[in-house]
Amino acid sequence: MSRVAKKPVSLPKGVELNVQPGLVSVKGPKGTLTLPKPAGVEIAIDGGVATLSANDPSQIALTGTVRAILANMVKGVSEGFERKLELVGVGYRAAMQGKDLSLALGFSHPLVFVAPEGITLSTPTQTEIVVQGADKQRVGEVAAKIRGFRPPEPYKGKGVKYAGEVIIRKEAKKA
C-alpha cells in the first residue's frame, strides 16, 4: 500500500463522512462536499477515523490520491481554505460590487468577476483579494483565474500575484 494511503483520516467533531456505493460525501459546518468513489478503493469508518484500502493491486496509487482528496475535503468542511492575492501596480485596484469582484488592472474597462457557487470573495484593502471556500481545488482554480487576468511581469513586477509569491525579476536591456 502507498505511504499516503496508510495514514488514517481523522474526522473532527461536527464532520460526518457518508460512504455510499460510488459516492463519498463529507458534511460539516462549512458545507457539504461529494467525491465519486473509485471502484477499487474501500473506505472504512471506525470511531471518528477513516481508513482506506485497495481491493486490487492496480488501485494502490489511486488509494493514496483518494485519501489525500478526502483529507482535503474534511479540512475544507471544518476549517475551509483561503488564498490571498495582491495587486501590484499604479492604479491597480479591486472592489466588491455586491457579490461580484470589480478589477481595475490597466485595461480600458474594469473587469467584473462573478464568484462561482461555494466561493466567497472579499477585499480587505484595494490591493488585496481573499478567496475563501470549502473546496481546495475550486479555491485554487478561482485564484488562478483572477491571477490570469494580469499575471505579474518580470521587469517591474506589476500584475496580480499570490501573497508571498516571489517574482523573479529581469534586468532591462542595456543600451
Swiss-Prot record:
GO biological process: cytoplasmic translation
Annotated GO CC locations: cytosolic large ribosomal subunit
InterPro entries the UniProt entry points to: Ribosomal_uL6-like, Ribosomal_uL6-like_a/b-dom_sf, Ribosomal_uL6_a/b-dom, Ribosomal_uL6_bac-type, Ribosomal_uL6_CS
Keyword Ribosomal protein listed: yes
Keywords: Ribonucleoprotein, Ribosomal protein, RNA-binding, rRNA-binding
Single GO MF annotation: rRNA binding
Gene3D superfamilies: Ribosomal protein L6, alpha-beta domain
Name of the molecule in the record: Large ribosomal subunit protein uL6
Species whose genome carries this gene: Xanthomonas axonopodis pv. citri (strain 306)
